[in-house]
Amino acid sequence: MLKKTLLAYTIGFAFSPPANADGIEIAAVDFDRETLKSLGVDPNISHYFSRSARFLPGEYSLIVSVNGEKKGNIATRFDENGDICLDQAFLQQAGLKIPSEEKNGCYDYILSYPGTTITPLPNQEALDIIVSPQAIIPIGLDLTNAATGGTAALLNYSLMSSRAEFSNGSSDYSQAALEGGININDWMLRSHQFLTQTNGTFSNQNSSTYLQRTFTDLKTLMRAGEVNLNNSVLEGASIYGIEIAPDNALQTSGSGVQVTGIANTSQARVEIRQQGVLIHSILVPAGAFTIPDVPVRNGNSDLNVTVVETDGSSHNYIVPSTLFNQHVESFQGYRFAIGRVDDDYDESPWVISASSGWNLTRWSAMNGGVIVAENYQAASIRSSLVPLPDLTVSSQISTSQDTKDSLQGQKYRLDANYNLPFSLGLTTSLTRSDRHYRELSEAIDDDYTDPTKSTYALGLNWSNSILGGFNISGYKTYSYDGDNDSSNLNINWNKAFKHATVSVNWQHQLSASENNEDDGDLFYVNISIPFGRSNTATLYTRHDDHKTHYGTGVMGVVSDEMSYYVNAERDHDERETSLNGSISSNLHYTQVSLAAGASGSDSRTYNGTMSGGIAVHDQGVTFSPWTINDTFAIAKMDNNIAGVRITSQAGPVWTDFRGNAVIPSIQPWRTSGVEIDTASLPKNVDIGNGTKMIKQGRGAVGKVGFSAITQRRALLNITLSDGKKLPRGVAIEDSEGNYLTTSVDDGVVFLNNIKPDMVLDIKDEQQSCRIHLTFPEDAPKDVFYETATGECQ
């Protein structure tokens, strides 16, 4: 980027007040010319900064912070007076609401949101903005300006192949999980296939194909094809038909917890803590404020709010948890499906399903649903209640009628979750079914004979900073014939020490179908010891199926794109040792993992995996190391630069020889950042704006363009005609009188955008002279700057 801000650095450090929020012009400052000269600044450019620290006219890529939260680099324009232009593109990337008045130019944000302060920081290439929290776009609220449309095809793949060799033979197995599809104008067609090959025998399992579209105005997602009965309270089945349900990405997200207060000074800092941990910090303007959707750690601990004023004073207050934790959420929105049950069942009747949910009050909710098919009907209703701040209770009753077999029954369920004092939590669940109650999938299964009579489940957890965390959970099921009764008990303890983490797990199972014989306890002890940059050593012992094993392993990373794992284990009873190792690598355009193992003297295993995605779009074919989701984008470097690393929410991706890269996953209708890793750029290339904020609707195929600037820079050693070095702080112009830069030290000039033939004019209060420079026609790509010498004559 053109470093036009270099002149402002010295003045900016000493003089950088914020832009006046009330529109009152700060009085002009008269700089002492001798003082400027002593600071190494040409007095002739002082008029640029006579009123406040500001940027020279033009466009800059600045680090923008809104209420203390960095929004990344945003292209920012300043007019001939150094005033900022808050246009629509800037406000969108900064996450600020756009004033209601229609306008294509610059918005008067101070008029729209009084109290706004804007502080340019030329010496840091940054811009600080303080606004009322009401001016910030909440997550999930603003659906405007989301990109829609676009066309691209995709193929996601996950391939695996393994071979096992034994003393008496061998076995081969391969599988391919494939997802193919195409996005056209927000419509999505997807087909899933799961192919396997076992010792030469091929099969195709679990295939499905469907068409999908989200209707934004209705906040509804529609799927047609092989879909599921997505009923919120009843079990469904796979059908050939149509499913309509709320699009979760269009539902308002956030905690729903808000904090209000009053700040006495502009740019006051509000700190919110829960359980002694800082969970949110934001700058607010003077006056009353409301902070929505505070990211609370839990709904049961009070919030401690501290307002730190600009003058250093502070005041704090408590927001009791009882004001915000007495609420429950239901599965809101209507869900509807109609179609024919697929061919995986004994019967394939036509079926209709409908369900919905309602929040009755902040502390009560209800869900209900029905399923109607040929010879089958079912209905259910579920209620949820928060009678106490730390107690949640829900109950459900379902009824079904199988007219073909003349069966009618009910099913009852009760759940409770109680957060007790001293970090103790309790969960319990009870389910009981009549002998003749049937879910849809059970009613159309001719072989279904033994329903479960009842299930009891209990969970208890407790944590302590000294003793660690404990978790106990178990369940017991009873069947009507008594042959399929079973029970399960799990106990877990874990504790993090200074140099290691220890965990102990025990599982006990008992099955009545095996005459109440012990199915074999599972016992596992693991010690993890981190070392180095990102490596972990483990020591463990496990007891299962009446056998004891001891082992040790090491896992870690070789580089940002490569990891490894090695393991050795000893079977105490069989007196055999097994060795295993694997290495995984992100090859920028796919991911590969290789593993091998040996057990005893006659057993060997080998396997390899490969996964990633392929996008076919109007710019060509682009490979991704990650799975490509419903909503994605194609990033493009305009100079076809390969190997540039781009960070996104889904992980890093790299440009190919065309300069393209797939941004594989974008959260629909949410603003997300895509950023160039400038360290991966060639040394002679700059990015005008290395961070782009994007927002797309579901199914959209977006385009993200990055303008690469091929920079020729030069470090010049300049002497005057008398042989002395050019003084520090002298302004340098081109032959047409345009300012270029300032000498940064005696005889030293750093110049951007050099040309093969250049003429530089140097003027100060004592003399003026001219320099003629000549550089090679072709710029070297492997150096940050070229060097040259010149004499000013």
Curated annotation (Swiss-Prot):
Tell me the superkingdom of the source.
Bacteria
A molecular function (GO) term = fimbrial usher porin activity
The record's GO CC annotations read: cell outer membrane
Q: Which residues form the signal peptide?
A: 1-21
Q: List the disulfide bonds.
A: 769-792
Protein name, per record: Uncharacterized outer membrane usher protein YhcD
What is stated as this protein's family in its record?
Answer: Belongs to the fimbrial export usher family.
Annotated organism of origin: Escherichia coli (strain K12)
Record's keyword terms, sorted: Cell outer membrane, Disulfide bond, Fimbrium biogenesis, Membrane, Signal, Transmembrane, Transmembrane beta strand, Transport
Write out the transmembrane intervals. Answer: none
Localization, UniProt: Cell outer membrane
A single GO BP term for this record reads:
pilus assembly
User: What's this chain's function?
Assistant: Involved in the export and assembly of a fimbrial subunit across the outer membrane.
Q: Which InterPro entries match?
A: Fimb_usher, Fimbrial_membr_usher_CS, FimD_plug_dom, PapC-like_C, PapC-like_C_sf, PapC_N, PapC_N_sf
Membrane-topology annotation of the record? Multi-pass membrane protein
